[in-house]
Amino acid sequence: MAKLTLKDLELNNKRVLVRVDFNVPLEAGRVTDNTRIRAALPTIEYLLDHGARVILMSHLGRPKGKVKEELRLDPVARELESLLGRQVHKVNDCVGPEVEAAAAALKPGEVLLLENLRFHPEEEKNDPGFARQLASLADVYVNDAFGAAHRAHASTEGVAHYLPAAAGFLLQKEIETLGKALADPERPFVAIIGGAKVSDKISVIRNLLTKVDTLIIGGGMANTFLKAQGYAMGKSLVEEDQVPLAQELIQLAAQKGVKMLLPRDLVVAQEFKADAPHQVVAVNAVPDGWMALDIGPETARAYAGALEGARTVVWNGPMGVFEMEAFAHGTEAVARAVAAVDGMTIVGGGDSVAAVEKMGVAGKIGHISTGGGASLEFLEGKALPGVVALTEK
């Protein structure tokens, strides 16, 4: 990597300000899924092992610049304590005299967790004064929050102007893994793009069409592509205004020699409900008043077949309404097929990650991306502000 990383830093006795992504789900004051906290442990433990005084900062939820008691980071501090097996000091703000005193009092090998950054409106505005206040707490800055790297906020971008700024292990792994897939993939390179809306993924598809050998489309967005091919989609979700664009992307794939796979059959239902009557139909036989909620079994087999022999796979977005059991089979079939690939596999996006975890195959995936929006913007070929701001080696 051309940017500073943890291994480049002199850490002994240094105060290190680390931006982590501890935006985790809470219920009744407890962390219900600690995946993101665990993902930051390698960086935190490396810093502690090298005698650093560690100051952690994160956002949680969307308090919109005001203090919301239910979004305080105390439950996160408790969860982190149990994972680290050592005390985590917690303060009730992220700037100000109390915080400055706590940071100054830290000893090597100790951890301080600051309060939710988004209690201050200046965080999301990337206010230079606020960024300078955060930076004043430490000697060095480390960004390990890939999930927030696409945001130019005070804690992800602003702080890097005032301190030597390095990538943590998680951020480094995300950038190197996704970067290699896009810049120098082993081939065949297959991308699977799903989710409800084409409009969310247009730039991703356009960028991937210049890189992949095969592009597989599923989920609600496939309906818009099928409509673009002239099929009647009943009352399926179709983005009418995106139909011409879908036609353009189908033509672009043909021009670039990219094999674009669309569903051949669909699971359709009478309404958007878990227990709605449903049936499998060919794409040219969607009944009036029915809606497509998953890819059909023939399509699932075709998609799995297209993954056989792939050397690089990127998957982002489910094949159907994964949260309803009746319409989860397509996503589950793709999850199994991706896990069976003997090459580099990268899975990103909440539903795709949930699918590989639910199927118990997460351990067989080469890289599970922790950043939804950030990994999408990376796949679009965009520069991420949180990465750009890091110090060059």
Swiss-Prot record:
From the UniProt record, give the pathway where this protein acts: Carbohydrate degradation; glycolysis; pyruvate from D-glyceraldehyde 3-phosphate: step 2/5
What family, per the record?
Belongs to the phosphoglycerate kinase family.
- In terms of superkingdom, the source organism counts as Bacteria
E.C. designation(s): 2.7.2.3
Record's subcellular location? Cytoplasm
Protein name in UniProt? Phosphoglycerate kinase
Q: Where does ATP bind?
A: 201, 323, 349-352
The residues that hold substrate are 21-23, 36, 59-62, 118, 151
Record's subunit section:
Monomer.
> Which class of enzymes does this protein belong to?
transferase
What GO CC annotations are associated with the protein?
A: cytosol
SUPFAM superfamilies, A to Z: Phosphoglycerate kinase
The reactions it catalyses are: (2R)-3-phosphoglycerate + ATP = (2R)-3-phospho-glyceroyl phosphate + ADP
Which spans are transmembrane here? none
Coiled coil (residue ranges):
none
GO terms (BP aspect): gluconeogenesis; glycolytic process
Q: Which species does this protein come from?
A: Moorella thermoacetica (strain ATCC 39073 / JCM 9320)
InterPro entries tied to this protein = Phosphoglycerate_kinase (IPR001576), Phosphoglycerate_kinase_CS (IPR015911), Phosphoglycerate_kinase_N (IPR015824), Phosphoglycerate_kinase_sf (IPR036043)
Read off the HAMAP family from this record.
Phosphoglyc_kinase
Tell me a Gene Ontology molecular-function term this record carries.
phosphoglycerate kinase activity
Q: Provide the gene name from the record.
A: pgk
| Alphabetized PROSITE patterns for the sequence | PGLYCERATE_KINASE
